[in-house]
Amino acid sequence: MSEPAIARLIGEGVERPEASLPIDINYAKLTEWLVTRQKIPKDWHKRLQVIQAKAAEAVKELPPGTLSSLTDGADAPVDYMRAVEIRDKLASTSERTMFGGLQGPAATWDKIVKAYEKQFVYLGEAGQCLVQNVDFEIPYLRRNAAKLAGQLADGERKQGEYTRAAAACAAKYKEECKKLGISGAAVRAELRALAGELPGLLRGVVDSLHQPRLQEAAEYYAAFTRFAHAPRAGAPSSAKGPASSASAPPALEPESMLPVLFEIRNRRTAPPEAESGAAGAGASGQGGGIEIDWGDSGGDAGGAGVAAIDIDWDAPTAAPEGDAAAAAGPAVDINWDFDMADLAAAAGDDAGGTAAAPTADASAGPVGIDWDIEVDAAGDAAADANNRAGDVAEGEAAASLSGGGGGGASSGDPDDVAAARLERDADYRARLVDDLTELRAFLAQRKSDLAAGGSELTATALPDAVSSVDAAAVASMLGSVQAVLGQLGTPRFRQLLLIATSPRYLDRLEARLQRQAGAEAKMLAAAAEAVARQHEARAGLAAQAPRTAALVARCRRLKGVVERGIAASLGGKRSVNVLGEINNVLASAGQ
């Protein structure tokens, strides 16, 4: 049988001789490959150290400016390629010997170059430099460049964030200042000036208190309370005389149920203590109760401005002892020998009873003593007298404000006095709010009751002053009361009141505004710092780019030197290719 015909391609590896194939060497195994194939001696490290020491000594004798004029600059290390460049530069300007040899520094560097080329020591140095540059130097520079690029991007992002935050802080500060009604130029002075708005707001509150609807609401409240608490027909009464009449007691009048509200409505508000001064103190002394000198103080401890009133009780006291007995005069004895039977009989006669006088044994009930004093009538008369005296005193004090004082009370207008009192007297203001809240609660409950219906039986027993008020009227009264309470409870009013009366609140408010104003400056400073970091990152990138490019170019030249040197050591018959990561590094640098 004949052999099958086999097609063979000319120029493929099968037909090419081995001597013509290229040699591929990994850059990381280059020195090992050279030593293994005995292209360089095993002690090439020692020989290289000797050559580098001679080169370092020769560098000191170079003319100034020689290194800076080289390809890689003055900072590049001295290796074989640099030695060749120095020799060629010096040889171009150096004198030669009779036989054409180099003289001076050029001859020294020519010897260094020949030492490198002897036994291909420079190939070991080139392989070592390739590994150092590809595995360490270039990756470090690239990581550093990526880090600087990240810092640059982060700086740009932070600059935008800080700029927006500064604008937000400025807008918030302006909004707070606008809400407070200040410009923000001089915070504390402007905040203090805000307190001047408070008298006008309080005068508006006082004017609202004079609405007729509030008077109707208070009278409606008093009428309903009198009806609810009035004694019913057939109920036992323990009082006698005028106290058992059908008239309402003073405590159930609108003026006594809502005292502060009607004090302002009747324009009887006393000025603040700081403005009333001694006149206010004198008025309070004249309008007070009657002081009784009991004779046991031993000095002039009675009320100032009011003479002590001596009351003769028509009863002797117990006998004093010692010096007190001598000063008090003769002793008087009191006979406490009462006959309870006689007292009970007298009480029975006064009551019109016909039964026999009870005895004083243990079975007898409690005995009441009639002192023949009408307590209720006397108390009412005394209370009315004191109220009239107090009204006169308060009126005089309010009238005296026209000649002195300051602020809103200096005009002498009772409404201005009330506004000043509400501003400076927290207790007085709280009592007014209590009166209005009490009135509002009553009206709200009555509105709910009237809206629920089913009160026909109760309505028949109500007096006309209560039954004539329908749900719509109660709602109108409730709206008036809530409007006044709304004026006293607005955030603006509370804030102005705190600014005017609380230095600590003023300090805290000023500190908060100052912090908001400083926040914008902090954000702007942070933005400026971010811009400075961007400049530093750009400068680092700008300085690093030429260094990386020079190092990559150096690696490319070293690679060519190695490939040509190994090919020359092999007689120039085979080409050499240095492979591995070095090609990726050079390719990425070329993009």
Swiss-Prot record:
UniProt motif Shuffled ATG8-binding motif 1: location: 311-314
Superkingdom assignment: Eukaryota
Motif Shuffled ATG8-binding motif 2 in this chain: 334-337
GO annotation terms (biological process): regulation of mitotic cell cycle
Residue positions of motif Shuffled ATG8-binding motif 3: 369-372
Entry's family note: Belongs to the CDK5RAP3 family.
GO cellular component, one term: endomembrane system
Name of the protein: CDK5RAP3 protein homolog
Comp. bias regions, Low complexity: 232-250, 386-401
